[in-house]
Amino acid sequence: MKHLLILFLLLTTNAFAQGPFGDYAVVKDKDGYVNIRAKENVKSKIVGTLPNNTLVYEFLDEEFNPSNWVHIDSGYVHKSRLKMVSEFPSIGKGKEQGNSITIAGKGIIVTLTKQPFDKTKHKITKKKHKEYSEYIIDGKKIYGRDNDEFLPKDHYKSITVTINGKNVPIPKSAYDDLYEIGIWDTNNFAYYDKEDDVLYIIAHNGDGYLAYEVCWQIVKGEYKTRIIGEPL
C-alpha cells in the first residue's frame, strides 16, 4: 500500500509539475543576418537566412542543448549568432499597483493591466479532443488553461507603452488570448536594445504545468511581434 501511495504521488507530481522554460534571443551578426544551415555544420547547405533582431525562442542552456547549434525554422543556427534578450539592459524594476504593474526607465514606460474575466462579454465554445475538451474564447485557443473544467479568472485589460513621450499602440490581438495573469515584479520585465531601438517586454503567467511566458517586441517605436514560450 505504501508503494502504491508513493507511485501515485510521483505520477500526480509529474503531471502538474512545471518543466524548464527556454530562452528568448535575437539574431545579432556583423553581416546583418545569419545563415540557417541544413545540418549542424558551418559547411552544411544554407537553407535560409534570418535578419538581425529576429526574435526566437529556443533552449540555449547547455544542460538542455549541449550543442553549439540551435534548431530554428527548417535548419540550424550557431549559438554565437544569437543574443539573449535578458542580456540587454533592463529599463527598471516593475512597480505593482492594484491590477497593474508599471516598468519605467530610460524614457520608456510600460504598463500591463489585468481584469477579471467576465464570461458574459465573450463568445465561449468548446473544442473536443480524444481525451478532453478545451475552451475556445472569442475564436482563439487560450493560454493559462488547457481544459473545460474551469473558466479563466482574469486576462489582460490593456498594455500601454510610451517611448520618449510617444504612445506605441499595442493591438488587442497581441494579448487577448492570454489568461491567468501574474502582475508581480518577479514576473514582468522590460529590456531595451538602445543601438537598434528595440524594446522587449517579457511576462510570466499561468501556474504549474499551465505556466507560460510571452515576449513582445517593439522595433523603432512600432509593435512588431510576440512569441509565446511554454515549458518542456
Predicted regions and their residues:
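Acidic, glycine-rich flexible loop segments
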Residues: K172-V214
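Mature extracytoplasmic domains of secretory-pathway proteins
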Residues: I136-W184, N188
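Short alpha-helix capping/helix-loop boundary micro-motifs
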Residues: E40-K45
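Short beta-strand elements that form the blades of beta-propeller/WD-repeat-like
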Residues: I108-T113, I142-G144, D197-H204
